[in-house]
């Protein structure tokens, strides 16, 4: 039995969100194929994600200097512990599905806040004399990114979404990365439904081997 972490970042309800609806199609097919797997849901707009702020940086600095968590200020303890909770949940998963829209050639700010909360030195990567090394490598972990945007940006230099997520997953050691991208729905609204159905087919296929 595998543990799937299903992370969404979208303000729109399922009924009108293209990325969420494609993600939902993936999830239904995935659970048909893997009925015994655990699925843990994280909604980055609903579930509070601790951002890196002055208290977090101060707390990390004290910990690196040899202090214990108990000696930090109340705010430092609370916020650092919350970051660790996010990272530990991420580490506990075997598979990851991220469902996102494109905002201004990248991601919503909440998504970057989440990545910052799980890409943590000593948790998901470490430093060595030869450079940073992902601590999640060679463990059979998989990542699927379901992403939508209104134009045609995928595969171009201007796309700071899919390539970034693939890179940061690899940085932590998760190298089995696949994406399902729905794009062009605003640029060519007459073909929006056709584009969506093509993405749904890709999502179903991904679910069958994920």
UniProtKB/Swiss-Prot annotation:
Gene Ontology MF, one: electron transfer activity
Known catalytic reactions: 2 a quinone + NADH + H(+) = 2 a 1,4-benzosemiquinone + NAD(+); N,N-dimethyl-1,4-phenylenediamine + anthranilate + 2 NAD(+) = 2-(4-dimethylaminophenyl)diazenylbenzoate + 2 NADH + 2 H(+)
Details of cofactor binding: Binds 1 FMN per subunit.
UniProt-listed InterPro entries: Flavodoxin_fold (IPR003680), Flavoprotein-like_sf (IPR029039), FMN-dep_NADH:Q_OxRdtase_AzoR1 (IPR050104), NADH:quinone_OxRdtase_FMN_depd (IPR023048)
Domain of life: Bacteria
Top enzyme class: oxidoreductase
Subunit composition and interactions: Homodimer.
Name used for this protein in its record: FMN-dependent NADH:quinone oxidoreductase
Organism this protein belongs to: Citrifermentans bemidjiense (strain ATCC BAA-1014 / DSM 16622 / JCM 12645 / Bem) (Geobacter bemidjiensis)
């Amino acid at each position: 039995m595998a543990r799937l972490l299903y992370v969404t970042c979208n303000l729109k309800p399922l009924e009108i969100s293209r990325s969420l609806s494609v993600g939902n199609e993936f999830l239904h097919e995935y659970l048909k194929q893997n009925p015994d797997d655990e699925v843990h849901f994280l909604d980055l707009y609903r579930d509070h994600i601790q951002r890196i702020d002055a208290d977090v940086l101060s707390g990390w600095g004290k910990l690196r200097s040899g202090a214990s968590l108990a000696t930090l200020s109340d705010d430092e303890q609370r916020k650092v512990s919350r970051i660790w909770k996010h990272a530990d949940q991420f580490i506990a998963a075997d598979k990851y599905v991220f469902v996102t829209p494109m905002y201004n050639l990248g991601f919503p700010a909440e998504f970057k806040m989440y990545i910052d909360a799980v890409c943590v030195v000593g948790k998901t990567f470490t430093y060595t004399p030869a450079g940073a090394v992902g601590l999640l490598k060679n463990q059979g972990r998989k990542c699927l990114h379901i992403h939508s945007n209104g134009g045609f940006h995928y595969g171009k230099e201007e796309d700071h979404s899919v390539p970034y997520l693939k890179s940061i997953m690899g940085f932590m050691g998760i190298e089995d990365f696949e994406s399902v991208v729905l794009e062009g729905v605003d640029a060519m609204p007459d073909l929006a439904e056709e584009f969506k159905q093509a993405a749904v087919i890709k999502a179903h296929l991904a679910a069958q081997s994920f």
